[in-house]
Amino acid sequence: MFRRSRKSEISGRIASKSYCRLVRMIDEYVAYHAASPIYSADLAEQCGVSVRTLGTAVASVRGMSLHRYLRLKQLWSARAQLVKGSDAITVTSCARANGFHHMGEFARLYRAAFHEPASRTLARARGTD
C-alpha cells in the first residue's frame, strides 16, 4: 500500500552511517574523559552537532537515551576495572575514576545494572568472596 521511495531508503542509510559515526565519537570521548563528569552539551560541541542530534543517534543505534548510554558506559568501565581485582583499587577509587562522585548513586546504579554490589565483584576478583 505505502512504499518507501528509493530516496528515503538512501537517506536512511546515510543517516544510519552518520549516527553510527556519532556513537563511535561518543565512545571515544567517554573513554578519554572517563574520570570527569560528562555533560551532553560538551559532548555535542565536541562532535559538532546538537544535543538533540546526539540523543537521536544514540536512540537509533543503541535503543536508549543519551544519558542512560553514558551512564552504562561508565558503569561497564568501572566493572572492567573491578573485575581485574587489583590490590591497589578500591570501590570508591574506581567509582571516582569513572566519573561517579556520589557513592550512594554509584552503589545503586551498579547493583541495578549487575545485580550485585561493586564490593562483591571486587572481592570475587581477588578471590576473597
Can you describe what each PLM-predicted range is?
Residues M1-A35, Y39-V51, T56-S65, R79-G104, ...:
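Alpha-helical bundle regulatory/interaction domains
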Residues L22-V23, L70-L75:
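Generic hydrophobic, amphipathic alpha-helix propensity
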Residues A107:
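DNA-recognition helix of C2H2 zinc fingers
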